[in-house]
A protein has these predicted regions:
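Hydrophobic, well-ordered beta-alpha structural blocks that scaffold small-molecule cofactor pockets
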Residues: 2-148
Length: 148
């Protein structure tokens, strides 16, 4: 069973089946060309959105945040990462020199855009960024790539 939150994948749970199944009758889909194409289109769109920015941050140091930097054409434009988890603050995104910081007005200085890399919490993050005084562009990623 798959349980969704805001149409996002939250987890995959398996239920033990006491009936013996024939492995040859199970219908697995290992690769979907359409998903690959859509992914590539979104990477192109993200790079187009980021083209004119020079000082960018990523909000979210989990799997999305660590992965997104590998797909950005000019990753040197990513100056910092934000995360509320104090255990991560002061650390770095994997294989990078991008430091993870507390999201506050002091750390927002000189930033032109923040990419939300925590889609399940996007609405709360956007609201929090604005409440904390961030005035630059926010790039939303939950349902579609767009500048807010």
């Amino acid at each position: 069973e798959i349980f969704l939150y805001r149409e996002q994948h939250m987890g995959l749970f398996f239920r033990k089946n006491t009936n013996i199944c024939d492995i040859n009758k199970l219908n697995f889909k290992l690769f979907d060309k359409n998903i690959y194409t859509l992914f590539q289109e979104n990477i192109r769109k993200l790079n187009n959105l980021l083209h004119d920015y020079n000082n960018i941050a990523i909000y979210g140091s989990g799997a999305h945040g660590n992965t997104i930097i590998t797909f950005i054409d000019n990753s040197e434009k990513i100056k910092k990462c934000f995360d509320l988890d104090i255990r991560k603050q002061g650390m770095y995104l994997q294989n990078s020199s991008i430091i993870i910081q507390e999201p506050n007005i002091e750390n927002f200085k000189d930033l032109e855009a923040i990419i939300i890399a925590a889609p399940l919490y996007e609405e709360e993050i956007i609201r929090s960024l604005r409440e904390k005084g961030y005035k630059g562009d926010i790039i939303a990623t939950e349902k579609e790539l767009k500048i807010i």
